[in-house]
Amino acid sequence: MKIVEVKHPLVKHKLGLMREHDISTKRFRELASEVGSLLTYEATSDLATEKVTIEGWNGPVQVEQIKGKKITVVPILRAGLGMMEGVLEHVPSARISVVGIYRNEETLEPVPYFQKLVSNIDERMALVVDPMLATGGSMIATIDLLKNAGCNSIKVLVLVAAPEGIAALEKAHPDVELYTASIDQGLNEHGYIIPGLGDAGDKIFGTK
């Protein structure tokens, strides 16, 4: 599995701000979108282009445009919504597929409860976004769902990843690509990433 920890100074700086324990909902939400945007820039750096001729201001001109599969952005509800706008800054015409999965706090197992995928998803590349890759259960379940629908071109974008989640994802889906702003120390006894960001969903939506 291709694993990319984005080490750009802006990514590290913004992620560091997100780790503040008393960060406001507004600021956390803004930074989640900004880091999501920077991860998208990295994840799409290998998209193929083709030369086409357009009518420029002074006559025909040859330019490069993206070719190949169109993109669907797949936020995992609910926290993934916090990164979605940042992703769409770079691919504003992308279609949006939504997957709802929550983690049982006792068993730590993923529980699917909603899905709405775009049509012809088998012809698209999926950018799956979720702030945290902890145990990997929710991400694996989401990718299972996408592959069952025919989508086989998948890139995962997360703010923070635990080594345990990376290992689980690689074992289940070695063909996907992972882009993260940080590979953190690991999980605590409750399945939370250390040092992590806390509960990203609560911080994005202001529910705690």
From Swiss-Prot:
Cofactor(s) the protein needs: Mg(2+)
Entry EC number(s): 2.4.2.9
CDD domains (alphabetical): PRTases_typeI
Activity control note: Allosterically activated by GTP.
Metabolic or biological pathway: Pyrimidine metabolism; UMP biosynthesis via salvage pathway; UMP from uracil: step 1/1
UniProt cofactor note: Binds 1 Mg(2+) ion per subunit. The magnesium is bound as Mg-PRPP.
GO molecular function, one term: magnesium ion binding
Keywords: Allosteric enzyme, Glycosyltransferase, GTP-binding, Magnesium, Nucleotide-binding, Transferase
Binding site for 5-phospho-alpha-D-ribose 1-diphosphate: 78, 103, 130-138, 199
Catalytic activity: UMP + diphosphate = 5-phospho-alpha-D-ribose 1-diphosphate + uracil
PANTHER family for this protein: ADENINE PHOSPHORIBOSYLTRANSFERASE, URACIL PHOSPHORIBOSYLTRANSFERASE, CHLOROPLASTIC
Family membership noted in the UniProt record: Belongs to the UPRTase family.
Entry protein name: Uracil phosphoribosyltransferase
